[in-house]
Amino acid sequence: MKHKLIDDELKYLDERSRDIFRHIVEAYLNDGGPVGSRNLSRLLRQTLSPATIRNVMSDLEHLGLIYAPHVSAGRMPTQSGLRFFVDAFMEAGDLPNEERENIEAQVKEAGHAQSVEHFLVQASQVLSDLSRGAGLVLATKHEGTLKHIEFVRLDGEHALAVLVTQQGGVENRIVHLPEGVTHAQLTEATNFLNAHIQGLTLSEAKEEIARLCSETRAALDHLSHHLVETGLALWGGEGADHKIRLIVRGRSNLLEDVKAEEDLKRLRHLFDDLETRESMAQLLDLTDEGSGVRIFIGSENKLFSLSGSSLVVAPYRDSQQKVIGALGVIGPTRLNYARIVPMVDYTAQLVSQLLR
């Protein structure tokens, strides 16, 4: 969907202005630096003098599409200019067959693993390797079906509650033991839970155990009953951000683009944001607003607005077409959008297929 800004600015740009603007942006995407009028005159299809090109560049600068990073420098696109370029000029082509086959082979191989976590980590790694940016996966902690729960005594006051899902996930929690709990009571609570929770999701298991406990209170002694109720209560009750896993691979790739102290500050902001993982649920909501790939450039990306980074992200869905996560590439604003957009889109489609 085009921004109104795009439609307004297209009215003022003739073919010559568009051609010059496009070459300025493409030069920036290639090497990250400004381009001057002399270099542009050699790149353009039309024969134009440097003076004529400078006049056009002045008009583009007045429109807020380009700027000079310092006096007597060439011109670079502004954030608005990059958005204008992406929406008005960029054509996302098809992935080369070699890259398509590479993504498919690696993602499908990881899909054979029992652990969904391993599968998503590999998807993030594939995106990082191919994009030379950082591959990012946001995954909701979807409810797998339960296979086994066990209490393992640690000391007189604590036990380790171990939950295993049929999808291969394992989670551990420390539970405080009521005074006087015996080994036999731990075993009784474990056996009771495992007799009734297999094949259920966690929320279904909680409802079922609550119902059974009210009906069979006499069948369990007081301490065993307490363990059964607290055993399942340990999981859940988390805020929205904590129900989302953030997987990032390829942070070191971002260091390759560092050219100045300002770049280091930008990266520090980005790494801090990735570590704190605040408001990740908001990003997941943003991906759900569209049907395909979303591109967030610079401050458009509210999560990483201080880092001067761009994010190309797409949702992946379950069999009911519900968004259950998102994946993408984060990097400098001079990402190769035309190449990365189809890469992210295809990977999201593969992940959706394999998780159904």
Swiss-Prot record:
Belongs to the HrcA family. It holds the Pfam family HrcA. It comes from Bartonella henselae (strain ATCC 49882 / DSM 28221 / CCUG 30454 / Houston 1). One of its GO terms (biological process) is negative regulation of DNA-templated transcription. NCBIfam families: hrcA (TIGR00331). Keywords: Repressor, Stress response, Transcription, Transcription regulation. Negative regulator of class I heat shock genes (grpE-dnaK-dnaJ and groELS operons). Prevents heat-shock induction of these operons. The gene is hrcA. GO terms for molecular function: DNA binding. This is Heat-inducible transcription repressor HrcA.
